[in-house]
Structure formats: C-alpha cells, structure tokens
C-alpha cells in the first residue's frame, strides 16, 4: 500500500492515477502493426537524403533513425515514379537488401549441413537479396538473426607520432516483428584493441574497460517498439540525430556513446509528435565517486510535406532525480518559466527547417537556443547561447551525385551550464562536438552507386579562445572573441558492399590545426551473415 501511495503521489492524487490507468488500458486495446528501426549508419539514409531534394520521397525528414516500414514505403514510392535509371537501380538495391521476404517457417544458412558450402560461396558472389544466418516467418512473427565478425586497422601519422591500432570484434544482429504489435531490433559488437595505448583510448566513445593493456570496445543498439492506434512507444538503448547536416548536428548528434531512452511518438496527417526521455552518464565519472543522476527530456512537434519540414522543440537536462513525468509531457514548457526564476535545469529550445524551393535544391536550417535575453540581443554579445547551422544541398537529376555547402556558428558559452548540468553525456557534447565560440564552413560531395558510397568533405573551422569550453563556467562575450585558432579538415571515405553481407570501408582524414598536421587512415572489413 505504501508503494501504491508513492506512485499515486507522482500524479498528485488517486483520481489522476486512475485516469492514467484507463488511458494505458485504452492504448493497449488499440493495437496496430509493429515495426523496427533501421540503424542510423545504414547506407540507405544517404540515398534518401539525396533524393529528398529531387522530390522523390513523400515527406522530408530530419530525425534519425527511422523505421523499416517507413523506409520500405519510400523506396516503393520512388520506384513508382519516372526517375533516372541510376536512382531506380539504387532504390531497387536498397529495397531488396532491406526486405524481409522469406518463405514461411524456419530457414538457416547452416541447416541442412549440406547447405553450408553454398552459403559460404554466396558471400563472395554477386546478389542483391541479403542472406541471414537464421530467419523465421509465421504469420505476424517474422524475425532474423545474423552473426557479425570484423576487423579494423587504423593509422595515425604526424611530425611526432606514428601510431596504429587493431580491433578484432564479433557480434550479433537480431530484429523483426515478434508479434502483431511489437517490433524489435538489436545489434551488439564486442572486440579488443591492440596497438598504441593512447591512440586506442582516443576511441573512448565506446570503450568500457579501463585496462590499458587490453581495452575492450562494446557497441550496443537496441529498441523494442510498440505501435498502437493512439500512441507509439519505444524503449531502447542507442542514440539519435536531429537535423540535417554534413558535419554534425548542433541539437543532438549520433556520434556519441549510446544512452537508455523511452520514446513516445505519434503521426497524425502531416504532423507528428515525439517525446524522448533518457538517463545520461555524468561527466568525469569515476568508480570511487558517487553516481549523481543526470536526465534528459525532449519534446518536439513537426510538420512534414514533400517540400517542407518544420520542427519546433525544447529539451531539458536536469539532476537530483530520475524519471519525472512532468519532463516527459508538454508540461516541460513550464520549466522555461522556472529557469527565469533561477531553476537549476539546463533548458533549451530548437528549430529545424528544410525546404525544397525547386527540384534538386534543398535549403536547411537548424537553430539551437541555449540562453536568450532580449537585452543582450542588441549588444555585440548577441550570439552568446545560440548555435546556427545553414546549408544548401543540390542533387543532380541524372546521376546520384549530391553537393552540399554548410555554415555552422556556435556562439560563446553555448551548451555550458551551472551545477554540473552541461549539455553533455559521458564527457561528450550532445550538440556540436567541437565546443563553442566557433565558425565552421564546409563543403561535401557525395556520390552513390548500388553497394558503393564515395564522399569527400572539406571543413575550415575558426574558434575563439574565450568561452569555447562548455565544460567550464563561461562568460558572455562577442563572437570569436580572443585568440583565433584555425583547423582545416579533408575527409575522403569509401564504403563498398562487395555483397550485401560483406562490406569494406576506407577513410582518410587530413587535419591541419594551427600548422600542426596530422593524418589518419581508417580501414575495416565486416561480415554480417
């Protein structure tokens, strides 16, 4: 009874608790068809982004990852249009690669035993349908299981360094619809590094072991998805990207350590609503220190058509407690008022917009508002607490080539906050990764073929020495104040799927920061069967 009273107190009274129970019962009685996510690093996303500016997709989107059925519907819609042969071949390739079409019952690449040689040979022969270790299909129960083995070898060269690291890993991928209303996706990779210890620790985004002699790398992404006629619910462990961009998102970027989350979403016509709650890891966490709670809640409302996508949202990082239902509903807007009254919470707002003025051209804009005061907007410190990202993308109609220009300005003091509530997770910024008080100009060329992705990116960043570290208390100042440091990057990457099961990647990165030059070569091979 005491436990029930505690639950009721969260909703401020038994009547509200009873109403919530009725709402949950109504939700679970209005079941729809399930679905599951496609990971944000899947090669289908660059293809969909390139075709959005050509009007080949039904809706523009700027939230990743997306769901399997949504992507299949977009690819199917594209094949119904009069598009260039090169784009049609790419759509067919991804449609076959992502399809779950299989015969009813149980299938395995290892059973019967005599099938093993044929399964092994198929890894190296040309085909478009993706083979899997195990598949099972029976009415609404349709799942797959694939094993993963891989090898990465990376090199760092500079005037003073010549380092390398080797990663051998294995894993599993599981997904599908396990009932009429529940979808599931999970991928797991685990490996051990060898090579230079300091170069290895530079990949600390995924490292979980403090053993310098044998550091482990673990990658986990999973989500269980429940779709109903009222609301869609997800519980998972992973990360997201909000907003288009060729460098990184200024709102929420996907290149950070994953985190646990609960997500509620709903599509109604051209509008959609998304609520996200997550438990973050505090910065500079050590085994001997107390684990202080750090939570993240986000709300956003989107309007999407085939030519325009507009999203307004707000998010909050708070401590001192874990799940708080007031942060997981639109009531979070009242926290903006609390902030004006010296609340501890780190409350932010954001806007994302994409517009296709004419065929082939996409203009996108992302705005992140960390702190705003009307009196400061009329001074030379007006950019303090703001981050702005503007890009123009052009896709050629006859060949799958996309060129994008992008400018990103992150104002002084953006992302920082008092009382250890920096806009961060495990010492990594949730927003733009290079800190604040910076201007970054970039251009990218992206070329696609079935099974092949080629990308060249050039970026030029200038950063002021004042108010550029969000992990420390920062004063308001003018944009690019202090001594200017410059950093140029050239990144060339190739991802090649020899077959749908066997893929290679090669990336070369040249970095020149204040005339100090470094070069990186990242290479790898992965078999997923």
Predicted regions and their residues:
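Exposed, low-structure sequence patches enriched in small/polar residues
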Residues: 217, 309-316, 321-529
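Bacterial N-terminal signal peptides
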Residues: 19-29
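Short, low-complexity, charge-dense intrinsically disordered segments
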Residues: 3-13
């Amino acid at each position: 009874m005491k436990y029930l009273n505690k639950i009721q107190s969260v909703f401020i009274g038994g009547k509200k608790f009873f109403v919530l129970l009725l709402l949950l019962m109504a939700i679970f009685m209005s079941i729809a068809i399930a679905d599951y996510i496609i990971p944000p690093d899947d090669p289908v996303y660059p293809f969909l982004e390139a075709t959005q500016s050509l009007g080949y997709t039904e809706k523009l989107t700027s939230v990743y990852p997306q769901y399997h059925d949504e992507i299949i519907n977009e690819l199917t819609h594209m094949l119904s249009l009069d598009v260039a042969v090169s784009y049609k071949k790419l759509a067919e390739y991804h449609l076959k690669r992502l399809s779950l079409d299989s015969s009813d019952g149980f299938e395995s690449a290892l059973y019967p035993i005599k099938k093993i040689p044929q399964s092994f040979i198929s890894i190296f022969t040309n085909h478009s349908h993706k083979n899997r270790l195990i598949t099972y299909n029976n009415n609404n129960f349709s799942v797959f299981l694939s094993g993963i083995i891989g090898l990465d070898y990376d090199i760092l060269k500079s005037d003073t360094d010549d380092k390398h690291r080797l990663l051998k890993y294995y894993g599993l991928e599981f997904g599908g619809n396990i009932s009429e209303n529940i979808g599931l996706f999970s991928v797991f990779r685990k490996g051990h590094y060898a090579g230079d210890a300091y170069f290895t620790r530079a990949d600390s985004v995924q490292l979980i072991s403090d053993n310098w002699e044998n550091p482990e790398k673990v990658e986990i992404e999973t989500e269980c998805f429940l779709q109903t006629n009222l609301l869609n619910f997800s519980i998972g462990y992973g990360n997201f990207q909000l907003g288009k961009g060729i460098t990184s998102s200024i709102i929420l970027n996907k290149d950070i350590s994953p985190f646990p989350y609960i997500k509620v979403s709903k599509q109604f016509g051209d509008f959609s609503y998304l609520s996200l709650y997550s438990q973050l890891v505090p910065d500079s966490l050590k085994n001997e220190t107390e684990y202080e709670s750090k939570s993240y809640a986000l709300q956003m409302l989107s309007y999407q058509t085939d030519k325009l996508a507009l999203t307004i949202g707000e998010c909050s990082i708070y401590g001192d407690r874990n799940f708080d239902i007031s942060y997981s509903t639109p009531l979070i807007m009242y926290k903006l008022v609390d902030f004006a009254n010296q609340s501890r919470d780190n409350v932010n707002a954001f806007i994302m917009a994409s517009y296709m003025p004419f065929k082939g051209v996409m203009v996108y804009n992302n705005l992140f508002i960390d702190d705003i005061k009307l009196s400061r907007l009329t001074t030379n410190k007006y950019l303090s607490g703001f981050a702005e990202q503007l890009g123009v993308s052009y896709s050629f109609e006859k060949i799958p080539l996309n060129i994008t220009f992008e400018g990103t300005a992150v104002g002084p003091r953006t992302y920082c906050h008092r009382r250890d509530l920096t806009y961060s997770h495990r010492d990594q910024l949730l927003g733009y990764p290079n800190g604040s008080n910076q201007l970054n100009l970039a251009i990218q060329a992206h070329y696609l073929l079935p099974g092949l992705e080629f990308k060249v990116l050039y970026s030029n960043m200038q950063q002021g020495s004042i108010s550029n570290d969000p992990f420390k208390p920062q004063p308001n100042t003018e944009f690019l104040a202090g001594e200017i440091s410059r950093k140029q990057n050239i990144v060339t990457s190739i991802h090649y799927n020899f077959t749908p099961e066997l893929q290679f990647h090669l990336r070369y990165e040249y970095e020149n920061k204040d005339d100090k030059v470094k070069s990186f070569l990242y290479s790898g091979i992965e078999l997923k069967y």
